[in-house]
Regions:
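A structural signal for short, well-ordered beta-strand segments and their strand-loop junctions
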Residues: 11, 75-77, 98-99
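A short glycine-rich, aromatic-capped structural motif
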Residues: 2-62, 226-243
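Alpha-helical membrane-embedded segments
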Residues: 216-228
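Hydrophobic alpha-helical transmembrane segments
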Residues: 205-219
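Surface-exposed recognition segments
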Residues: 35, 95-189, 213-215, 229-244
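Conserved hydrophobic ligand-interaction patch in extracellular adhesion modules
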Residues: 44, 56-92
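Short, flexible loop/turn elements at secondary-structure junctions
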Residues: 16, 48, 79-80, 103, ...
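Juxtamembrane "helix-exit" motif on the non-cytosolic side of transmembrane helices
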Residues: 197-206
């Protein structure tokens, strides 16, 4: 099967693009960690299609996945989409635009950085335009199949010419010693120390000597609760320095 000639293709020479964010926190944190991804050259469709439009283009009653596979087409990787968006080759659509990458809820830890699709296990990465206020869609995860999503197409090239080896992956997770020191310092300076300072100026005489276990536990609770809103940002992982 050949590619439908009515699809307008945009050529991109590839390049290095940053994916993910560094801000941490259960509610307000970014999907991260932020890292550079080296994207090889590709061609992406100028239009985002619905599943119904894809079937009409090829005039076949075949599952979309099979249509794309036999036509040597696929959804764009996050790196390809991000690079095309940054270079203003593509613009907004209504609703959600799906990408080919599948990653766990915990983020990009352990994922390749050479431009290949991330996955294969996890949730599908999306760009959600519905809440965009500045013209930039939100990164998100598609937790279940959604027939209303749209997607662009990328022309496949022989993968052996581009992707080999392990994909130069990110670390599998945050460095444990650094995390332990970070949590200890946050507990002391954000939770425990302020609790003792408050007690020193406001509690009755002798309260600190009698109630210090409660002050420590209260400080630890404050520290743990703060993780909902904030944790120190991770530095961006550069292509030449991902083990920092």
């Amino acid at each position: 099967m050949t590619t439908n000639p009515s699809i307008e293709w945009l050529s991109n020479e590839g390049g290095v693009v940053t994916i993910g964010g560094s801000r941490r926190g259960i509610i307000f944190g970014h999907f991260g960690p932020a890292h550079e991804c080296e994207v090889p050259s590709f061609e992406i469709s100028s239009k985002a299609f619905s599943q119904h439009e894809i079937k009409n283009l090829f005039s076949e009653d075949t599952p979309v996945e099979e249509l794309l596979r036999t036509s040597h087409l696929r959804l764009p990787t996050e790196g390809e989409w991000e690079l095309a968006f940054q270079q203003k080759q593509i613009s907004s659509v209504d609703g959600i635009e799906a990408l080919i990458d599948y990653v766990p809820e915990r983020g990009y830890w352990g994922q390749p950085t050479d431009g290949r699709p991330k996955g294969p296990r996890g949730f599908q990465i999306i760009r959600d335009w519905s809440n965009s206020k500045d013209g930039r869609p939100k990164t998100g995860l598609l937790f279940e199949d959604n027939q209303s999503v749209s997607f662009r197409l990328v022309r496949e090239v022989p993968k052996a010419m581009i992707w080999d080896g392990d994909g130069d992956p990110l670390p599998t997770g945050p460095e444990p010693v650094r995390r332990a020191i970070e949590e200890l310092l946050i507990a002391i300076f954000l939770g425990i120390l302020p609790s003792f300072i408050w007690a020193f100026f406001n509690a009755r005489p002798g309260y600190i000597q009698e109630g210090w276990p409660g002050l420590v536990l209260g400080g630890l609770f404050i520290s743990a609760f703060s993780a909902i809103f904030w944790r120190p940002s991770y530095p961006e992982f550069k292509k030449d320095n991902k083990n920092s």
